[in-house]
Amino acid sequence: MAASFVIVIVISFFISLAFMCYVHYTSRQRRKLHGYGHEKAVRLPPGSMGWPYIGETLQLYSQDPNVFFASKQKRYGEIFKTHILGCPCVMLASPEAARFVLVTQAHLFKPTYPRSKERMIGPSALFFNQGDYHLRLRKLVQGPLGPDALRALVPDVEAAVRSTLASWDGNVSSTFHAMKRLSFDVGIVTIFGGRLDERRKAELRQNYAIVEKGYNSFPNSFPGTLYYKAIQARRRLHGVLSDIMRERRARGEPGSDLLGCLMQSRAGDDGALLTDEQVADNIIGVLFAAQDTTASVLTWIVKYLHDHPKLLEAVRAEQAAIRAANDGGRLPLTWAQTRSMALTHKVILESLRMASIISFTFREAVADVEYKGFLIPKGWKVMPLFRNIHHNPDYFQDPQKFDPSRFKVSPRPNTFMPFGNGVHACPGNELAKLEMLVLIHHLVTGYRWEIVGSSDEVEYSPFPVPKHGLLAKLWRDDTVSVETDGCQNGDNDDNGVAMV
């Protein structure tokens, strides 16, 4: 009896302690957010902050994140607050609000990532920074990713596409894994030109794969954990890159590729050359940005074309005409030909909208900011919700329908932001689209494929892709027929997709 009484007392103590912590936390939040440090009470956006310390993180991860954000928008409107991943956040789901944060008042919101992510990629990487350093570096990076450089890169992208499809031929494989290989190869040739030997390439691929596995892991530095292994692999990556830079300097040939441009740039403080650390951070950052996002979109494109057979035949007809002009594919694709793929380009735009690989982006308010009568407190995270905007019927009619014809007319300003917006928009977006165009050309004119198993479920790794990476069997078919009847005259296919 005495033991039971003691247990009751102990349990009651901890319940009381938890209740007092809750009261302390909520009262502290109210003082902080309703007049603390302000002459008048502030008005926060509507929403829920969830449980103390935990916030609404459990709700976010117990369901599709897009469903979580969509339900919040439906309940609270286009600006609402929440508390996730240990941070108070303001979510913005309107084009005007996204432009406010990313363009017109971008100086009030800094890019922000968890410290563990910065450590893994490198704190000097382009997308972790702002201000003069960011502007100098962005201008530098845009050179090797601009039209002139991409024009010369078409043969390399085409070679990478051919190699990827050839290795897949006759096999059942994860589409996502195949597309990751392709995106990595394109990233390597963009960074290093054609000057990287296979040994170095294998070292980079092997260590980057370990970094990638640990990117979303819990930041635990105990030996054996994914995070620990990723940090060790990141150090080895830095070592490989340092060796490559040392070899180039010894030859007196830094090169004109992205690595060479970074090595010769005076984008550092006070016009100084970038340090090897800064160069390595940016190379690893480019590899990260170039691989998973592009591979995810390519995976969805393969699925969307498979699921809409008449659309596939219309795309095949467009690409077959280009193939015929290239002597049945014996001649290489040209930059001009990639600019002429009108229907294929619309398919890519609709895939970017429909999949919305980048559902949102993180910013942090550097001062108290007022927007439409609401306060965004200093230090709060701010998240423009791209997917919510891309799937809003006010901007895209019947948004759950895959309809490339909607891009016959340009979307309303700030309603379509697959690569972000403002000074932090992805500088490699044209390279990504070139990769997609070349992949589609060779896929539809030389191969057939079928999806194995269900493709309706979605997984996050870390970007959304069909479950298991979209298992598919692909086989070579040089006799691919082109059935164009009704496919280029605005007819609907069997899946209700309007053709362009």
Curated annotation (Swiss-Prot):
Topology term for the membrane: Single-pass membrane protein
CDD domains to which the protein is assigned, alphabetical: CYP90-like
Molecular function terms, GO-annotated: (+)-abscisic acid 8'-hydroxylase activity; heme binding; iron ion binding
InterPro entries linked to this entry: Cyt_P450, Cyt_P450_CS, Cyt_P450_E_grp-I, Cyt_P450_sf
Transmembrane segments: 3-23
One CC-aspect GO term: membrane
Family: Belongs to the cytochrome P450 family.
Name listed for the protein in its UniProt record: Abscisic acid 8'-hydroxylase 3
Gene from which the chain derives: CYP707A7
